[in-house]
C-alpha cells in the first residue's frame, strides 16, 4: 500500500481545516485535530486520521454539535464535571485540563467526569496527557451504543467499554495500558469483515446467539467480553462509572454514532493521581527501577513504551498516511462549503455499530 508522509503540522492543519469546514468551532476543531494526529503518531491509525470521516459525518448529520460550548463545573475542590453539550469529549477535556491537573497536584487525587459527548476516540490520549504533568492517569468510557453481551447473555448491553491507565517515567515515554473490555476491538472485526478473514472463536455470537467465526455475522450479532465473566465484570464496572457516575447515556440507550441525528451522549471518567504526595519524591526512581527489572530480568512487555518511542520518531520524520486516504481528505477539503461526503468514495467506517 502506498503512503504519503505528512509532517505533524501538515496533518493537523488539514484535519483542522476539514473540521472547521464541516461546522466545528476553531476550539473544537483544534482539540479533535490534536487528538487524531496523536493517535496516528502512536501507531493507531483506525482512531487517527481514518477516524476523521466519522467526525465529519457526525457534524454534517447532526450527531455532534461542533459549535456548542461545554460547561465546566467544580462541585468540590478535586471534583470536576463537564457537560460536553453534544460536542466532542476532546474539547471538554481541554477545557477542564488545567484545573484538573492543578486539583490533582494540590489534593493528591482528582476526578473529572465528561457527559453528553460524541464518542471519545483514543482513550489512551487522555491519560497520556496527564503523565505530561507527572500524574498517574486512569480513564474509562462507555464508548457508544451497545455491542457486547453481559456474562451469560446473548444480547448487547455494553459497548466495548475500554479502560486506559498511564504512569509517567523518569526518562522516556510513559507506560500506557489501553484496552477494551470486549474480547477484541471493534476495528479488528471490521478489518476481518472487509478482508473476508475468519475471526477466532470466542470473539462473538451471531444474531441467533450462536458462536461465530464470520465477522459479518459478528457485526450483526453481539461481541463477547475477554476472559468471560471477568471481562464482563470489568465492562459493567466501566458502564457504572463512565455512564452511571457521569450521568451519560447507558450504552443500551445510546444512539448510534454512525447514523441518525442524535448524539450518542456517552461518558468519560478520568482519575488523576499525584504519586509524590502519597509516597514522597522517590516515586519516579522506584517506578523506573521496577520497570527496568521487569524488562531486563524477566523479559516482560511494557505496554505503551515502544509506541511512545515510535511516536517520537514519527514526530521528527513525519506520519505515514495511506495515499488513498490522504487524497480523499484533500479532495474533501477542496469541496469547501459543499460538505457532500457522498461525492467521495467511502472508506469503511471503523466505528459502525452494525452491518445492515
What residues fall within each predicted segment?
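Short amphipathic alpha-helix starts
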Residues: 9-10, 355-356
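Phosphate/diphosphate-binding glycine-rich loops and adjacent basic-rich segments that engage nucleotide
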Residues: 147-216
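Catalytic-core signal marking the mid-to-C-terminal active-site face
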Residues: 2-5, 11, 245, 250-336
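A detector of short terminal or domain-flanking linear segments
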Residues: 334-355
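A generic, well-ordered mixed alpha/beta core segment in the N-terminal half of proteins
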Residues: 80-170
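Active-site cofactor/substrate anionic-group-binding motifs, chiefly glycine-
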Residues: 47-101
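Secondary-shell segments that build the walls of catalytic and ion/ligand-binding clefts
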Residues: 194-252, 257
Amino acid at each position: 500500500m502506498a503512503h504519503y508522509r505528512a509532517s505533524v503540522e501538515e496533518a493537523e492543519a488539514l484535519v483542522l481545516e476539514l473540521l472547521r469546514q464541516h461546522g466545528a468551532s476553531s476550539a473544537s476543531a483544534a482539540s479533535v485535530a490534536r487528538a487524531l494526529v496523536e493517535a496516528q503518531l502512536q501507531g493507531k491509525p483506525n482512531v487517527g486520521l481514518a477516524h476523521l470521516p466519522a467526525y465529519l459525518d457526525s457534524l454534517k448529520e447532526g450527531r455532534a454539535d461542533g459549535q456548542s460550548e461545554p460547561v465546566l463545573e467544580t462541585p468540590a475542590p478535586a471534583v470536576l464535571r463537564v457537560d460536553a453539550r453534544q460536542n466532542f469529549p476532546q474539547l471538554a477535556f481541554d477545557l477542564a485540563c488545567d484545573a484538573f491537573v492543578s486539583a490533582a497536584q494540590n489534593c493528591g487525587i482528582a476526578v473529572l467526569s465528561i457527559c453528553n459527548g460524541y464518542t471519545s476516540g483514543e482513550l489512551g490520549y487522555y491519560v497520556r496527557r496527564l503523565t505530561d504533568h507527572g500524574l498517574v492517569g486512569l480513564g474509562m468510557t462507555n464508548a457508544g451504543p451497545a455491542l457486547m453481551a453481559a456474562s451469560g447473555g446473548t444480547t448487547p448491553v455494553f459497548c466495548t467499554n475500554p479502560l486506559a491507565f498511564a504512569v509517567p517515567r523518569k526518562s522516556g515515554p510513559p507506560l500506557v495500558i489501553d484496552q477494551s473490555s470486549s474480547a477484541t476491538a471493534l476495528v479488528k472485526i471490521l478489518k476481518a469483515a472487509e478482508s473476508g478473514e475468519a475471526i477466532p472463536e470466542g470473539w462473538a455470537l451471531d444474531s441467533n446467539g450462536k458462536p461465530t467465526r464470520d465477522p459479518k455475522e459478528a457485526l450483526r450479532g453481539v461481541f463477547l467480553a475477554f476472559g468471560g465473566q471477568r471481562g464482563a465484570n470489568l465492562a459493567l464496572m466501566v458502564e457504572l462509572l463512565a455512564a452511571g457516575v457521569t450521568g451519560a447515556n447507558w450504552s443500551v440507550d445510546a444512539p448510534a454514532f454512525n447514523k441518525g441525528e442524535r448524539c450518542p451522549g456517552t461518558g468519560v471518567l478520568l482519575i488523576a493521581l499525584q504519586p509524590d504526595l502519597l509516597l514522597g519524591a522517590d516515586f519516579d526512581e522506584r517506578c523506573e527501577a521496577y520497570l527496568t527489572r521487569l524488562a531486563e530480568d524477566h523479559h516482560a512487555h511494557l505496554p505503551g513504551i515502544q509506541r511512545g518511542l515510535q511516536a517520537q520518531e514519527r514526530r521528527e520524520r513525519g506520519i505515514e498516511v495511506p495515499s488513498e486516504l490522504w487524497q480523499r481528505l484533500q479532495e474533501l477539503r477542496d469541496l469547501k462549503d459543499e460538505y457532500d461526503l457522498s461525492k467521495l468514495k467511502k472508506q469503511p467506517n471503523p466505528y459502525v455499530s452494525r452491518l445492515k
